[in-house]
């Protein structure tokens, strides 16, 4: 009941016909750990079937040489369409606390880590996240990511991680202390149940990602402006008056990141 991008393994030339059940655009890449002595691309993107048909003879040749591929549906859209559901689930199969939100943008460019995050989300993400966690039947901290596909209006599963990822503080600043939940559960203390703040928009902003994006990505100003000033409440990552050490330690890597972003923008690196 949870939609996800379909994937096909291409192990023989006849498998090249199995893409008919996939929806374009598609991404194809060699399977991990296959014959590295063969000269082969890392990733190919097919916008339409015509593009795939042009590349098909070369793919068949590479398969004959021993290379296997994985081809997957690619969900179009930028990095503003990625949603998060995170929870802590007990060994008795009960979700003790949970929060959901979205990545406002990603860094670097449209991939990788989050650039800023928010408590803005959809009830569909909450429902699908709970269903997936129950189906996995694991315990501990679980995070799932969904990408909104505006072609059919569905939130499609992108990945599941059995740990907290970088935007985890988004949950804490919107009222859900998931790591406290984990600690108290592990130490057999009473666990308090939290309700996430949804009445106001809260943005979690690490400038160590936002500034390089602003420098390196053309047209990023509109996202920067929204991420920094577009919420009812903004929380800076790292920077806190009560404990300035993390901020001070981060200044050097922050400056290095800025210099690298400038070089990228000037095409020097």
Segments from the language model and where they lie:
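Phosphate-binding site of ATP-dependent enzymes
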Residues: 13, 47-108, 120-130, 147-148, ...
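Active-site nucleotide/adenylate-binding loops and adjacent lid/helix of ATP-dependent enzymes
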Residues: 1-70, 91
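Flexible, glycine/charged-enriched surface loops at secondary-structure junctions
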Residues: 70, 139-143, 192-198
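Glycine-rich phosphate/pyrophosphate-binding beta-alpha loops
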Residues: 104-116, 161-175
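Glycine-enriched catalytic-core subsegment of oxygenase/oxidase enzymes
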Residues: 173-180, 186
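Conserved metal-phosphate-binding beta-hairpin within the catalytic cores
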Residues: 134-169
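Peripheral (often C-terminal) accessory segments that flank ATP-dependent C-N-forming ligase machineries
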Residues: 184-269
């Amino acid at each position: 009941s949870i939609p996800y991008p379909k994937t096909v393994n291409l192990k023989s030339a006849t498998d090249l016909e199995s893409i008919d059940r996939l929806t374009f655009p598609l991404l194809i890449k060699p399977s991990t750990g296959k014959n590295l002595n063969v000269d082969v691309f890392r990733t190919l993107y097919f916008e339409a079937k015509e593009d795939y048909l042009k590349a098909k003879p070369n793919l068949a040749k590479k398969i004959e040489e021993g290379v296997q591929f994985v081809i997957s549906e690619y969900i179009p859209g930028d990095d503003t369409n990625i949603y998060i559901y995170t929870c802590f689930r007990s060994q008795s199969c009960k979700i003790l606390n949970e929060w959901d939100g979205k990545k406002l943008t990603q860094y670097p460019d449209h991939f990788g880590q989050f650039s800023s995050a928010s408590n803005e989300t959809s009830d569909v993400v909450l429902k699908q996240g709970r269903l997936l966690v129950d189906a996995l039947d694991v315990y501990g901290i679980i995070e799932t990511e969904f990408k909104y596909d505006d072609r059919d209006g569905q939130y499609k599963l992108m990945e599941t991680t059995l740990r907290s990822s970088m935007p985890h503080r988004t949950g804490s600043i919107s009222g859900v202390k998931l790591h406290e939940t984990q600690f108290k559960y592990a130490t057999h203390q009473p666990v308090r149940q939290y309700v996430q703040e949804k009445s106001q928009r809260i943005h979690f902003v690490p400038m160590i990602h936002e500034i390089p994006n602003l420098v390196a990505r053309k047209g990023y100003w509109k996202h920067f402006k929204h991420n920094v000033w577009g919420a009812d409440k903004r929380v800076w990552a790292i920077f806190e008056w009560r404990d300035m050490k993390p901020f001070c330690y981060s200044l050097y890597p922050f400056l290095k990141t800025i210099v690298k972003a400038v070089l990228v923008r000037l095409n020097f690196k």
